[in-house]
Structures are given as C-alpha cells and as structure tokens.
Amino acid sequence: MFRRACLAAIAVCALGLTTAAHAQGYKEKVKEFRIGLLGGENTQDRLARYGKFQQLLQEKLGIPVKLFPAADYAGVMQGIAAGQLEMASFGASGFAGAWLDCKCIEPIAVPQENDGSTYYYSVLVVRADSGIKSIEDMKGHSLAWADPNSTSGYLIPSATLKAKGIKLDDGAYFSKTGFSGGHEQGVVAVLNKQYDGAVTWTSGQGDAAEGYSRGNLRSMVDKKMLKMSDIRVIWQSGKIPNGPWAIRTALPDDLKKVVTQFLLDLPKSHKDVYDDVERGSGIGYAPATMELYHDIIELRTAEQRANRS
C-alpha cells in the first residue's frame, strides 16, 4: 500500500512538472515577442498609443515585448515574412497581401464596432470650403491615396473608381494622384491644400462631428489635428472587413493561445488601452477567421494579375 501511495505521488508530481513545462514551453523557443506597427501616423504617437499595451502583454507572456514602428505598411509585411516580427495589427488588404506573399500568418482577433459588427468604411474627404460635393466634382482635381497596401486608403476606392470607368492615370480624370504616406498624412495634405481630396477610414458609426466612433478621422479629432467642420465627406464605400491582429503561424500553439486570449480579454480588463490601440471606441475583439478576408484576398490577387499583365 505504501508503494502504491509513493507511485501515485510520483505520478502526480510528474504530471505537475509536465503541465508546468508545457505552460512555459514557448519561453524556451521564443525569447522575445516583436510587434510591428503600421505606418500612417507619426512614430511618437504610435509608440505612445501602444505603450500600455506593450507593458500588459509583456506581463502576460513573461518574455520581453518590443514595438517596431515601420515607415509604411510594406515594412510590417516584409518583417512578418522574414520572421523578424511575431505579430501585427493589419488592415484587411495588408493582411491579404502578407498572406499571399508568405502564407505564414493567421488572423486571431478582429475589432468589433459598437453595434457588434466587424466592418468599417473607406471615405473620400475634401475641404469644406472647396465647393467639391461629389466624385463627379473631383474631375480635374487631385487625389491622395494613403498607402498602396491600405484597404480603405487605396484598394477599395481605386477598385470602385475603376468599376465606374474612371481612369486613375494622372490627367485622365484627376489632375494628379499620389501616395501621401498614410491616412493621417493624406488628410493633412487636404487641409494644407496640397491635395484636393484624400481617402481614409472610419467606422461610420457614432457622432460625425467627433470623427465617428473609431478611425483615422476620430484619431485626428482627438489629437486636435482636425475639426470635422473643416472637411466634407463626398463618398463612402460599402462595408469593408476590419483588419485583424495576425500572428506568425509557425509560433508555438501555447503562445498563440495566450496572445489570442489576451486580446479577447483586453476590452474588459483595460478598456482605455483597447481604445488607445483601436483609435476610438468599440465593444472589443471577436475571434478572426480566414473566411472574413476571402473577398479581399481575391481582390488583391486580381490586382496582382492586372499589374503583371
């Protein structure tokens, strides 16, 4: 009987050690967790928005968490593909492009708007005093895209305009087009009369006078860079799936589970941090699936074919 008790105790201890080792397993393989921050906002503001997020995730993982702000969307996409970043919050098009490039990432969480939806909108904005009130009025005027890998800042509006028969070459319809370097920069260029119009993103929900509930316009209003009375929205897209938090597929499963649960819990445990990261309000994150981005991946694939032809 004593022997059976000893064997039972040894078994329990062994199970405990195995469980503990499994729980800490990813720490032996992953010494630091690197997060890529998309361009489109000045570096200081990006690092400030993610500072508390970085600290909380580091406490949860028990390994160093580092932030890497990229100059543009492509920098984050390339960092993920090269294994130099573990995770990033992508736009839908950026995620689709990164997935098409390396097939090495998977979506884990997607922001939900205040009504529980997981969609947002692309909008075209002009100065309120410009006299421009429609896409038709934009003929002969200049248009700023945000970034070639932005969903709302390029992919969707350019595809929509092409579907209307509008040619995007300089002088064909618009006097000129160009990439501003990001959403924030595009709106600033309009305010400074460097471009007549710019495309950016918004939740399309909430008080329009405050820049809506979430998005670039809301962020700029909150930072006192913009008064909504100074601009006019002349076009809005159809629904676009919110971009996901995506993580490298090759990472240990236990690490991916901890990070995913951290994101899902964040709005309840630290709503202020969630609002900082997502640039406005929302009810939280939902689990993300590849299915949500199927149409965007198809659109990116078609764009790549067209560019090669």
Language model segments and positions:
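N-terminal export leaders
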Residues: 2-8
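Bacterial N-terminal signal peptides
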Residues: 8-16
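Sec/Tat signal peptide C-region and signal peptidase I cleavage site
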Residues: 17-23
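An extracytoplasmic/periplasmic, membrane-proximal ligand-sensing/linker region
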Residues: 26-37, 41-52, 216, 247-309
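Bilobed "Venus flytrap"/periplasmic-binding protein-like clamshell domains
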Residues: 35-60, 70, 93, 117-188, ...
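Beta->alpha turn/N-cap motifs
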Residues: 69-73, 83-102, 110-111, 183, ...
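A structural signal for short loop-to-beta-strand junctions that line the ligand-binding cleft
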Residues: 105-117, 230-235
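Pocket-lining segment of extracytoplasmic ligand-binding domains
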Residues: 144, 148-252
